[in-house]
Amino acid sequence: METQVLTPHVYWAQRHRELYLRVELSDVQNPAISITDNVLHFKAQGHGAKGDNVYEFHLEFLDLVKPEPAYRLTQRQVNITVQKKGSHWWERLTKQEKRPLFLAPDFDRWLDESDAEMELRAKEEERLNKLRLEREGSPETLTNLKKGYLFMYNLVQLLGFSWIFVNLTVRFFILGKESFYDTFHNVADMMYFCQMLALVETLNAAIGVTSTPVLPALIQFLGRNFILFLVFGTMEEMQNKAVVFFVFYSWSAIEIFRYPFYMLSCIDMDWKVLTWLRYTMWIPLYPLGCLSEAVAVIQSIPVFNESGRFSFTLPYPVKMKVRFSFFLQVYLVMLFLGLYINFRHLYKQRRRRYGQKKKKLH
């Protein structure tokens, strides 16, 4: 005996570019919905007029449609959307003139052609308005947002490093050399904040928000945080040494010239004195900072050897103990290599800025 094919109730509506079909099946499982040779094929397990069964139907469309139907399942029905290949109104849904018994208009969504024309015109106007706004307003808006973001970032960093610089300077004039030994406990929190925030600077260079080369920014970020978090931050014996003062002072002295220069660049201002300081003060300050960091690393080697912190033993068959001081010695080599890379980068910047004036003098 031939199995009876069960068809669900299907309601349809249209717009100029789309067809909508609502299949009256609840609790649908395993739906198979596809379009081949301009025919919509539907088959699914669900609860319909004949109870919980497998329902299916096939509809050959009146005109050409795109072969990728979209559908959405709800608890009570299946909503199918089909894109027309041409934007025009159909007089009926199917190629056969006689409407299938299971098919009916969806009066909840139905529009006549004049209503649909008005809706289409409204959507087109909305799209054109959106494109015009994007074309006219978007580039300027994005540029302003970028400038505002960079200005605020540089301002926050300037305030942070200025606080450190002023704090260290005032305490030195009041306490003299005694101020060297508790530098870490007085300004470490602010230095942690500024150096963690410096990650943003590296990311800006990496994603193209700024034109800064990634390598110099990354070298400075990793180098400083190695000193701050590992050498100083993990060993209390290092936090009371005078070298902390010189490291923090050189870092903050460099940044109080660099960040205000970047701030003014965001608003297209050029203060000649500040520009000269930004392109000149690094010449003595970067080597002093590098020397201070090297002294800090050298002083920390016996401290790490004595404590054994971060040391580890290689697994069998090597079974060799690797001290953290080995990595500190490697870092010393990398420190001066990084200094060379940054020095070279800054020298090129200075030559681009002032090189032409020197040529004109000869």
UniProtKB/Swiss-Prot annotation:
The gene is Hacd3. The modification N-acetylmethionine is found at M1. It comes from Mus musculus (Mouse). Pathway: Lipid metabolism; fatty acid biosynthesis. Residues 5-94 form the CS domain. The chain crosses the membrane at residues 150-170, 190-210, 213-233, 243-263, 281-301, 323-343. Its EC number is 4.2.1.134. Catalyzes the third of the four reactions of the long-chain fatty acids elongation cycle. This endoplasmic reticulum-bound enzymatic process, allows the addition of two carbons to the chain of long- and very long-chain fatty acids/VLCFAs per cycle. This enzyme catalyzes the dehydration of the 3-hydroxyacyl-CoA intermediate into trans-2,3-enoyl-CoA, within each cycle of fatty acid elongation. Thereby, it participates in the production of VLCFAs of different chain lengths that are involved in multiple biological processes as precursors of membrane lipids and lipid mediators. Belongs to the very long-chain fatty acids dehydratase HACD family. Keywords: Acetylation, Coiled coil, Endoplasmic reticulum, Fatty acid biosynthesis, Fatty acid metabolism, Lipid biosynthesis, Lipid metabolism, Lyase, Membrane, Phosphoprotein, Transmembrane, Transmembrane helix. One of its GO terms (biological process) is positive regulation of viral genome replication. It holds the Pfam family PTPLA. May interact with enzymes of the ELO family (including ELOVL1); with those enzymes that mediate condensation, the first of the four steps of the reaction cycle responsible for fatty acids elongation, may be part of a larger fatty acids elongase complex. Interacts with RAC1. Associates with internalized insulin receptor/INSR complexes on Golgi/endosomal membranes; HACD3/PTPLAD1 together with ATIC and PRKAA2/AMPK2 is proposed to be part of a signaling network regulating INSR autophosphorylation and endocytosis. It is an enzyme of class 4 (lyase). GO terms for cellular component: endoplasmic reticulum; endoplasmic reticulum membrane; nuclear membrane. The modification Phosphothreonine is found at T7. Its main location: endoplasmic reticulum. The modification Phosphoserine is found at S114. One of its GO terms (molecular function) is enzyme binding. This is Very-long-chain (3R)-3-hydroxyacyl-CoA dehydratase 3. Residues 171-189, 234-242, 302-322 are lumenal.
